[in-house]
Structures are given as C-alpha cells and as structure tokens.
C-alpha cells in the first residue's frame, strides 16, 4: 500500500497574533514545520505547537527563515553571505531543539521557509549553506527539499537524508520551480482540484505546470500551507481522497 506524508507550516504567529488554525491543521498533518522566531513564532508559540504535535504523534521539524518578521520571511536579503546563512539556520534549529526538549519531543527534520527556500532552490551558495548548517547541527536530521532543485543537489552532496516535497496548493513553472506568489494563480484554493492534483503526484510522480507541461517529481511529502484560505477544508478533502484511493498517510521521519 502506498504511503505519503502530509506536512504543514505551523507556529507562524507572534505574541498574541495568530496565523491560521494550528489546532485544526495538526489534526490532519503527519509532520509539521515550526517557525523558529525569525520570520514568525516565538518561544511560547514554539512550545505550544510542539506540545500539540507530541500529543498527536506528529513529527516536528524546524522551519528557519530570514530574520524578517515584518515581511514574514518572504523577502530576499541581498548581499547575505554563506556564513551568515549557516549561522541563522543553525541558530533556529538549535532554538527549536531546545524548546522541543522542554516539551518532551525531538526535532526530526528541517525545511527552509519562504524567500530563504526560494533563493536556495536556484542559488548554489545558499543551498549549500543551509545543508552545511543542518549537517553541523545534526547529520541525522532529514532535509526537506523541493524536488529537482538546487536544495536537493546540495543535500545529496552533504550526505543528508532527503524528503522530496511537493506543494498541494501552489502552481509550478515549467522548470519545476514554484510560481511566484506575486503572479495570479500562484496559490490554488479549490479543494477538489487540489485533491485530484495531489493524487496524481503521489500515484504518478508528476504534476502539470501552468503551461500544461508534464513535470516528473519525486514525492515523499506533500505540503499544505496553514495560512492558505480554506486550509483546513483543503487538508480534510485531501486526506479523504487519499484514503479513497487506498493511500495511507504517515510521517516520513520521527524524532
């Protein structure tokens, strides 16, 4: 029987401000990626999110991004060096590891956020710096990468275990990169369309680009963004469609 992981980015509020419905999404995901205080999140939110994950038996991962609360980590940082990237990634992983220990859980994986991930998918230096930081902190951590990207290449070169990620609610360009959020149609919202699209990804390892090109993608984990409008309904519909097709959902890694 085929099995797939469903991951979600959570803990992306700050102080009293909340982003998305973490409690509902964590009931539907099998892995979660927790903001570590740079693009969103704080110590209390991190701890609360880890506790929710532990109670549900959900795998926990660090979701490091650029230090950009105002821009939610979705803006590139021109001129940043490889050493600075290594430092900020290691810092955020370590922060979540400490908070997870306090909550009686362990960090199993790392997935870069927003602009950090987008830049790394196309820039060798950024991708290698992220991989180097993960390897230095704990080489057993699974590195979640966009399939067929420079992140994948860097992770392989570093000898890390990889989980190849596809996105349920994002459109793809012909080169297998994600369509920029600045473009119309970049984010998908129809639960039925998304469920059928993901089913094809899981069963056939393929997705149609915005121009209709068939792109082959290895699929280990499917991301559903918790801040996408209707995220809970999308996740419920996806799980139901996968179950209907005889596909189980399970974490790709455990801490």
Curated annotation (Swiss-Prot):
GO biological process, one term: carbohydrate metabolic process
Keywords: ATP-binding, Hydrolase, Nucleotide-binding
SUPFAM superfamilies in alphabetical order: Glycoside hydrolase/deacetylase
Catalyses which reaction(s): 5-oxo-L-proline + ATP + 2 H2O = L-glutamate + ADP + phosphate + H(+)
GO molecular function: 5-oxoprolinase (ATP-hydrolyzing) activity; ATP binding
EC identifiers of the protein: 3.5.2.9
Domain of life of the source: Bacteria
InterPro entries registered for this protein in UniProt: Glyco_hydro/deAcase_b/a-brl (IPR011330), LamB/YcsF/PxpA-like (IPR005501)
Primary role: Catalyzes the cleavage of 5-oxoproline to form L-glutamate coupled to the hydrolysis of ATP to ADP and inorganic phosphate.
Entry similarity comment: Belongs to the LamB/PxpA family.
Protein name, entry field: 5-oxoprolinase subunit A
Organism in which the protein naturally occurs: Rhodopseudomonas palustris (strain BisA53)
Record gene name: pxpA
